[in-house]
Amino acid sequence: KPSRFLPLLFAAVAGSALAQVKWDLPAAYPASNFHTENLVQFAADVDRATGGKLKITVHANASLFKAPEIKRAVQGNQAQIGEILLSNFANEHPLYGVDVLPFVATSYVAAHKLDKASRPALDKLLASQGMKLLYTVAWPPQGLYSKKPLNAASDLKGVKFRSYNPATAKIAEMFGAQPVTIQAADLSQAMATGAVESFITSGSTGYDTKAYEHIRYFYDTQAWLPKNAVIVNQKAFDALDKATQDAVLKAAADAEARGWKSSEDKTAWYLDQLKKNGMQVLPPSAQMSAEFKKVGDVLVDDWLKKAGPEGKAILDAYGKM
């Protein structure tokens, strides 16, 4: 005859199934990228800390949503959590572009300070859109990749120049280059087909996309350190019990510290790999540096006009740190 314990067993199994929460985490970069590896570690830490109650699945390389779609997906709870490049959304609100203002924060120490100065306003902005910021991690400093040698900004005239955010589109425009919108997941193909001849990005993305197979020159301009941010849908977060929320926040704090360290530690390694694979890694000429700085000043002025008193307060706070 059936055991009288069976109903209890079924109830226990059903209860554990109901208690388990599953989140999807779309990310735009390859599984081998340090940001993605950090996300996977974050998900594993959450799984372990919650005893399997919260399972986060990382979908790398824009396999679930393309880079520009991830924020909207989290906002609409199509994905409960996601990783975004903040500056992708600078047209939506200038605050998302504060970390790509050219030559404002060009080192990890400076980027940390700018992150700290802008975090309260960023928290508030995301909260107004139904999201919570869990953590940020900076990319290595941005340099200029080119198929041909560049001595001055005029050498970029007419060149197909990848733009991935409003700042890079504006730079292309001011240098007389031809802006082409290409996300990181499509960059390898764009180089192979000749759709792009020059771009600004980190040594990390250059290495991930094997830029050295198509591009000869990397100018180490150290223009800015853009940030990725991991955001969560506020309602999805609020639906977790307190212990699970605390586990997520602790794992996020650990991921932020680990991610920033990894980014800084790997900066020189990425440039060495580009060199080993035949690229010339060079400082920009004095003329090019001066021209870049001029463009940077214009972009900062433009940003301050759009960002208003809130933007000025952030840069003032950053300047005092």
Language-model features: locations:
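Bacterial N-terminal signal peptides that target proteins for export
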Residues: 1-8
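Sec/Tat signal peptide C-region and signal peptidase I cleavage site
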Residues: 13-19
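N-terminal secretory/targeting leader peptides
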Residues: 20-110, 118-321
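Short beta-strand-centered segments that line the small-molecule binding cleft or hinge
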Residues: 113
